[in-house]
Amino acid sequence: MQLEELINQHYSKLNDNDFHILKYILNHKHTCYHLGIDALAKACSVSRSSILRLAQKLGFSGYSEFRVFLKWEDQPEEGESMSFEKLLDDIEANLKFLRTKDMTDMCQLIDAADRIFVYGSGNAQKICARDLQRMFIPRHRYLILIEDTNEFNLMRDDFKVNDLFIIISLSGETPELIPQARMLSAKGIPFISITNLKNNVLAQLTPHNLYATSKPVTLSDRTEIVAFAPFFLVGEALFRAYVDYKEAEKNDNE
């Protein structure tokens, strides 16, 4: 688990002082773990106890354990990776995440939902959404694809608490998407977020998060490319987890 995921997981516990400290840590990831608790407190202009409380809110026993986590997370690669190698790094990071991710709660939501809506916030995300829709057909779960904001707004009064949304967003910060996600949350309609692995608003609005690690690569002409293969991989993993969930349920009933 990376720091951004921990922030999303414990977001409701954090206050402005915590975010001030985290801003410093995120901006000095490669050096802050060299600092003892007093030095970090001084760098952030906060008290020693503020650092300790933040570490405990994030699930660590104390600052020493948090510091080891930060050191472990900072694993620089040897040399400059090329685009293809970075794609492989992204895929390996996603496989590592998926091997340890328990999706039972999401499978239960999929199984119990009267209707399942899938919503991608951009063109590439919509392709991922259509692929997810296609995968679930053999399992007789027919996902309803929402094409855009206008469609969502036309349908919003018909959404029920027994529905389920799967929302795919690269950033998790798309301006037109956040009010819609907040509306779902306010109405008690569950949704699964699939976003890039970083601190983002969409992931903070639901406990049901999946992350696709996809780091941008800047080419020599300053063109930036982002891989969407990790999003397809995460979608496939969700489907396979659901298949296994239903098979296990069938075996238990025999």
From Swiss-Prot:
List the Pfam families: HTH_6 (PF01418), SIS (PF01380)
The record describes the protein's role as: Positive regulator of the glv operon expression, which consists of GlvA, GlvR and GlvC.
Q: What induces it?
A: By maltose; repressed by glucose.
Q: Does the keyword Transcription regulation apply?
A: yes
Please provide the record's keywords in A-Z order: Activator, DNA-binding, Transcription, Transcription regulation
Task: Quote the protein name from its UniProt record.
Answer: HTH-type transcriptional regulator GlvR
Q: Which SUPFAM superfamilies match?
A: Homeodomain-like, SIS domain
InterPro entries per the record?
Homeodomain-like_sf, HTH_RpiR, RpiR-like, RpiR-like_SIS, SIS_dom, SIS_dom_sf, WH-like_DNA-bd_sf
Gene name linked to the record? glvR
Domain called SIS: residue spans? 106-248
Q: From its record, what is one biological process in GO terms?
A: carbohydrate derivative metabolic process
